Amino acid sequence: MKSVINKVNRFPIIFRSFQYRNYRLFFGGQSLSLIGTWIQRIATPWLVYHLTGSTFLLGMVAFAGQIPTFLIAPFAGVLTDRWNRYYILLGTQIAAMIQALLLAFLYYTGTIEVWHMVILSIILGCINAFDIPSRQSFVVELVDKKEDLGNAIALNSSMVNGARLIGPSIAGVLIAFTGEGMCFLINGLSYIFVIISLLLLRVNPRKTNTNKQPILKELKAGLSYVNKSLPIKYIIFLIGLVSLTGMPYTVLMPVFAKEILHGDSHTFGFLMGASGSGALAGALYLASRKNVLGFGKIISMAATLFGLGLIAFSFSSSFYISLGLMVLTGLGMMLQMAASNTVLQTIVDDHMRGRVMSFYTMAFMGTAPFGSLIAGILADKIGVPNTILLGGIICVLGALIFISKLPELRKAVHPVYVRLGFIPAEISSGIQEASEFSATPNE
């Protein structure tokens, strides 16, 4: 017992999930791999715009890469609940590595065309449809204590956004001096680190669902489960709305950097890096919190901040003002997404975890292709700034709807938090309702 306490005390509360060996390994491998992922995410739209000069095709390639997530993720969620998530993850990392190396091969042989990028983006989207819900659900198996789950998820978000901060900056330099092909090659090689980390994990075989029903029946059960849980339903609704209308701003960034700010690939990289720095700050803030109490208010405030950030950004023609606004936008985006993920992972029953996280994935990434396609069309018609402005306004309206539902969500989530031990059952009802889902976020 004393050794366990000493091990915990070696890590500050913000990094307490590092007390678990499996989590440390997974975090390390993913951190290096995600830098490569973000390098490729920057290089792909930049190469498309370089080859075509078309905002419509920018949206089309993004649509192709994300539509499989919308179509496949719900079924992937059912299979995630059935199969061993560890082996799903291992397979998706190997497949993603092959996809990146194929892009590099086509680039260096001088044969790459937009249709190649569309097809390979579709393939990556299919991989992500299985990878994301599996990875989100797998985090639960890396920490021993339920109360550390929120910290692990927040640290994962900080890992993603640390990579989001570093990756675009590296991508900007690589594109300028070596071309997009090096970005694809580095991403492909970076998967080696996460594959090694997965092979080194010591995980107990997870009990799989032996009472298997037809996939459509299990999918229907998952939808019914989400519909009956007000917190899960409204959290996923807000994520879907923000992803559909607000997140496509990232697809339009190459155009904004070049046409509005009169910059180049460095400008694009700095803008995305600024957004990543804000997101990193948000993730570290959530990691420093002791539990999920008050996350409902954080979600609503963050969605509002994200929308207002986009509105202000749409009026900016200054590089430095745009950088500052991207920091705020990234902060709002990450606070909403990470807090939503944490609440969902905390309150969901384990036998439904894969399906619920697949619906989260569908809302977060699956709606984005439609948003990207619409944004590309709108940008051709009304311009990039007005398209971003419209998305920001809709995000703020969605946040206001969520805020109006907070009293109902408090009542719905209260018994779950009591059962999990986050709230003492003997505390009076009035105090309980004021102290959990929408408590002042300063615990």
Residue ranges and their predicted role:
Residues R24-T44, G65-T80, N84-Q99, H116-A176, ...:
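Substrate-agnostic recognition of the 12-TM MFS/MFS-like secondary transporter fold
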Residues V61, L71-F75, R82, I88, ...:
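C-terminal transmembrane bundle of multi-pass solute transporters/carriers
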Residues S137, E141, E180, F184-P214, ...:
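Helix-loop junctions on the cytosolic side of multi-pass membrane transporters
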Residues K7-P68, S224, K228-S275:
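Helix-loop boundary and gating motifs at the non-cytosolic
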Residues K2-Y23, V203-F237, G421-I431:
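Juxtamembrane intracellular "pre-TM" segments in multi-pass secondary transporters
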Residues P45-T52, L103-T109, I166-I186, E259-I260, ...:
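Transmembrane alpha-helix termini and helix-breaking/packing motifs in multi-pass membrane transporters
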Residues P45, A100-Y107, A171-A176, V194-R202, ...:
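Structural signal for membrane-spanning alpha-helices in multi-pass inner-membrane proteins
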Residues T37, G53, F63, T69, ...:
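Short, conserved catalytic or interaction motifs in soluble domains
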